[in-house]
Structures are given as C-alpha cells and as structure tokens.
Amino acid sequence: MAKRWIAGLALTAALFGHTARADDAPPTPFIVIDQFGYTPAMAKIAIVRSPETGFDAGWNFTPGALYQVIDTKTGAVVYEGRPAAFRDGAVDPASGDHTWRFDFSVITAPGRYLIRDKLAGYDSYPFDIAPDVYKPVLRAAVRMLYYQRADTVKDARFAGAAWADGLDHMGKGQDGEARLFSKPGDKTTARDLHGGWFDAGDYNKYTAWTANYVIALLGIYAEKPAIWTDDFDIPESGNGVPDLLDETKWGLDWVVRMQNDDGSVLSVMGLSHASPPSAAKGPSFYGPATTAATYGAAGAYAYGAKIYGGFAPFATYAADLKARAIKAWTWAQSHPDVTFYNNDPRDHSEGLAAGQQEPDAHGRAVKALVAAIYLFDLTGDDTYRAYVDAHYTDGDTDAIELLMHYAGLAQATPAIAQAIRTNVTQGIEPVWPKGEADAYLSWVPGYWWGSNLIKANTGNLFADEALYGLGAHPAGAAMARAAGYVHYIHGVNPLGKVYLSNMKALGASNSVNRFYHTWFAPGSTWADVRTSKFGPAPGYLVGGANPTYTWSKGCPQINARCGSAPPSPPAGQPDEKAYTDFSDGWPIDSWEVTEDSEAYQIGYIRLLARFVD
C-alpha cells in the first residue's frame, strides 16, 4: 500500500475542522489526548503516533521538533516543548504504531487548550484543564444506570426528550407476573419481579451479577461519600439521599424481590426485546434458585444493610436486609451445590436470557467468601470471620477490593489481614515494569471481549495500591499510573476514540456513535449519533478493542447478511485497533466489540470517581 506522509506541511486548516476533503483525512488522529481533559495537578502527556500496521497503515506522520500548547480562547502559545520518541521509535506491537510523548504537565491553569505540531500545523482535539473536569463525565456515566432501569417510565424530565419512553415490561405475563421458565403454563408460579437494570445491550436480568453491581456501587459510595450529591437528575433527586445510593437501591430492591421465603434466591430473568423498551410485549420468565445467586444476594443484602443503616429513613429497610442476608447465607450453606444453567441444554433452558450466569465451583466459592466478608462487617459474628479466615485464598484479582475491605476491619484477624495485604501487594508489584513499557500508558495483560473493563480494573488496581498504602511506590505515583487508564478510555488510544457514547455535548470530539444495544438498534430513532434523529443515550461505556472478534460460526454460508468477510476493523487488526463503531446483530455479532455492560460501566465509574473531589 502506498503510504501518505504528513510532515512539514501547513495543515493548520486541515483535519478536524480543517478544509481538506473528507476522503483526504486520515482515519485516526496523529496526536491523541484525553478529550475531556485533565485536572491541574495531573501528569499530562499527549501521545503522537504514526501508524505502521493496521487499517490506518497507509498514513504516516513525522512529528516536528517543537510542539505547542495553544489556549483556544486567545490563540496564545502557552508552552512549547519537544516530543520524545518512545522505545527509540520502535513499533508498538499492541497498536502497530510508532509513538512519541509530549509532556505538558507544567500547564496547570484552568482553560481550554489543544496541542499543535508547530512545523506541520497539525492540531489535536481540544481539551479542558479544570479541577472538576471529570465531574460531568462521572454524572453521565452514573446516569447510564438510570437509562438501564427496567419496568419504569423514562420521564423526559430525567431522561431528556430524546430518550423518553413509556412503561416497559409491565404488561400481562411480564415482570409484574413473571413465571418459572420450566412451567410457563402454571399461573401459580407467577411472581412480581419488577425492577433492576437491563444487564447490557440485552434486557435480561441476572441475580448474581446484579448483586455484584450493588456491592461495587456501595463500595464506590463508601470510598468517597462526599462527592455523591443528590442532583444527578434522576426521579429520586432532591430526596436528601445521595443519588448513587438511590440508583443502587433500584438494583438492590430487585434482588430483594428475587428471594424466596426459605432464604434462597432466584437466579435469572429473561425479558422480551424491542426498541424502545416499552415496545417489548412478550412474556417474562425466571430461573430457579441457586447457590451462587443466593450467596451473591447475601453479600448485597449485608452490605446494603450496613450502608443504608447509616440513614435514619432507611432503618427498617436496613433491618430487613440484615435478616435477608442471614437467611440467604443459611440456605446457601446447607445447599452448597445447587446450580442452574440458563439458555443451556444441560437444564433444558434454551431461550432463557443470553449470558451464562452460572459460575463454576471456584466462582461459587468466591461468592461465599464475599458474603461472609460483608456479613462479618455487618454483624461481627465469629462464624463469618472464621469462614473468611479459612477461605480468603479463594479470592482472586476480581476480589481484591473485597478482601481489602475485610483486611481493613478493626475486628479482622490480624494475621489474615496482613496475609491479604501481602498477597495483594505481590500481585500488584509485577505490573509496574510492564506498565512502563506501554506505548499508550495503560498496560493490560491482553485484549479480548470487554477489554475496557480490563483497562478499568487495572487502573483500579493501581488506585487500590494508593488507597491502601500497599507496595513500594508513593501514592501519587500509583494514582498517576491509574490515571493512564482513565485517559485511555477518554481517547489516549490508537483510534483517538472516547469509548463512551454520544459525549459531544460534554466535550468529546470523537466519542462512540453507535454500539450494540436492543434499544439503539440499527434503523431505530436512536441508532447512530451521525445519521439517526437522536443517537444512543450518552455515557455508555462500550466493550472496546477485541482482537478475538469474529462473525458467527458458519459465515458466510449461513446467511447473506454475513457478507464475504468479517468487518475489518475490528477483524485482522493489531490488538488496540480491533475496534469500530458498529451495532449489527446476528450473524455479524457486534456485541463482541461494542456492547455495553453494567460490569464495564461500574468498573469505569469506580475508576473515574477516584479523580473527582
């Protein structure tokens, strides 16, 4: 392929608001920055890039000797410096790019800026520097959970006129009177199981996963309660309770409804699908109680009782949650191996929901450990402490925050608390040198389905090191490393893509235009920011780069919609370029790349909240 070189050219009027023809513009920007911006004290490093492999390899960029920071309001040059080649200009295998770094951390004055290659006249997207630069972004990310609420009217006052919708999934045979999947004709199995959140781009609801989300959100609140105000424009705003807790309660209340009288907890719900959600008229079904769902719920009930118990209006609610947590634990302890595989021939459940919520034995053990941690925190009962002490090694990297929660309790067994701290530190330390070798300042062990969650979780790992005083690195250094993962999601990546949907109004120049979601389906009013009336709702974090993506098994023979080859990108690209905005369903299966998830969203919320004061 013939390469196009951009070096030493006067491009002040080109690209991103320039006058060059659209077909002359490179498909990816050559200077990438956090498109929302930076807090004044943050390290600020723009990545300059020249593609070598991947779909944009036809373009090359040679940076000039001097880079400038431009105040967009005045046009003044406020700083000038030199970009430094990363790894002596070697190609980064994860991105397929040559990269350089331009450090402009000396700029701390609030304002709106851009980075300019002085010789080429080439500009980055604009960005802000401000103490509260991420606050509106965090608000949008949390409001995604409101858009994902099931069984409610999306009032225009809160959703905005573009995403207002009527009551969903509350008609005959739906969530208010859902039936057991294995007995669809038995009206005696009907249960009121309304509430909760659509789990992802599908509308299904999974108990153990929702319990995880509840626990994570409660932990996010507990870490920095002062930042969680009562003004996120959800229906509960202004009630005197932080809106994050109001939103969390929406999910927790559904987990409460899923509990049986004997303490066991139902596992999953399958809902019908249409765009918008209120157009979905098919019946709703649920799966039976399982050990995993019950342990998961026990942990959510217990932590909920602890947090909501701190608010006088929730005293009765907290007491009920405590009783439910103990009852769920008791049932799960006496029923340690009750499983249900939804949408699976093993339990004749094909068609019930989509994702497989039933974990393996290790996954059940982790859920039991989590339940014991929060029950001990709530009750101080030695039964739960003894369980944690005997099983803390069942935890893995996904349970670090939970284990550290136990280690921080005054009544935790000192030797076990120290062992947890040692184990976590030993897990974090090897990541440091790897992180230093990453071209885009956000190393992860690999890229696959849901890579943006891997990014968020790795960033949270460094932030945990700072929070808990682990390892040999100063807290400031650990937080600086964590910030790299925020910046990646906000555009410091080979695509210059903000991996959040429809964020132009909040300052992003290149955010997600379309992604896989039943509501925002192709051809709908909400399909694409660029071509549909409204585009998808703002603030959704998509899955991200996935080099393992492929079309459905059997393509191209199984359906004409396959086309002749899987779309590239994402297929056949370097790891970090294995992404494009697309929303096709079967057989193209865009959900492997662009679908949202409550898990992705909450991991990102946790990370971003750590940079909001």
Stretch-by-stretch model annotation:
Residues 236, 240:
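Acidic, glycine-anchored loop motifs typical of Ca2+
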Residues 123-129:
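Edge beta-strands of extracellular beta-sandwich domains
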Residues 7-15:
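Hydrophobic helical h-region of N-terminal Sec-dependent signal peptides
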Residues 23-27:
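Proline/serine/threonine-rich low-complexity linkers at boundaries of modular beta-sandwich domains
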Residues 31-121, 143, 147-211, 215, ...:
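Aromatic (Trp/Tyr) and acidic
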Residues 18-22:
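Sec/Tat signal peptide C-region and signal peptidase I cleavage site
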Residues 241-264:
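Carboxylate/His-rich catalytic cores and anion/metal-binding grooves
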Residues 326-330, 337:
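Hydrophobic, small-residue-rich alpha-helical packing segments that form membrane-like cores
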